[in-house]
Swiss-Prot record:
This is tRNA pseudouridine synthase B. It comes from Chlamydia trachomatis serovar D (strain ATCC VR-885 / DSM 19411 / UW-3/Cx). InterPro entries: PsdUridine_synth_cat_dom_sf, PsdUridine_synth_N, tRNA_psdUridine_synth_TruB, TruB_C. The gene is truB. Pfam families: TruB_C_2, TruB_N. Its EC number is 5.4.99.25. It catalyses: uridine(55) in tRNA = pseudouridine(55) in tRNA.
Amino acid sequence: MELATESIEGVLLVDKPQGRTSFSLIRSLVRLIGVKKIGHAGTLDPFATGVMVMLIGRKFTRLSDIMLFEDKEYAAVAHLGTTTDTYDCDGKIVGRSKKVPTMDEVLTCTSYFQGEIQQVPPMFSAKKVQGKKLYEYARQGLSIERRFATVTVNLRLVKYEYPRLHFVVQCSKGTYIRSIAHELGNMLGCGAYLEELRRLRSGSFSIDQCIDGNLLDEPGFDVSPYLRDANGLILQPAPVL
């Protein structure tokens, strides 16, 4: 049965495909269901994949500020030996190094990222300074003084095969995984950038609860069986066949 547009509301968990912007997914959802009041609980860069919490309807978009403050978990790959201006794979290469860190060095440096740490937001970020986003300054070739922010992280090394360092990190709001990759490169003395990023969890919502984001581009796709409440419960369970 087709739902009336105004009755479509809830939390939709989407696995963002690589190469898509967060806002392009929102636009696809608006076209699909005809509801304009759609928010989110945290964007992802185009190269990143994983959990996007989409909030449909006024009742749920009001939860955006609360959900933005929830912890998140990521699987990431840092590429050692190369530095970029954006700290990620979309940036311009600004440095190279032939140093190959040892496993002992990697273990020592990754152990730093436990508990509260001080982190400076990257210049290519949406963080505002003096009413202007940092990336706007960066695109003008300017580097602005930025304040340290205290964030909480729990980093676990998964695998190290030079030049790639695989890790999983649980972190608080405002943590830049790009900056962690960049800082690891500095600590190891070889430079690094973030090559891959996948959000595994946002608050209590996990990747195994998500639908493929490409489905939002399929005309007539019915999102109603996948809508959840704020606690993650399915609002309209699919019928048992």
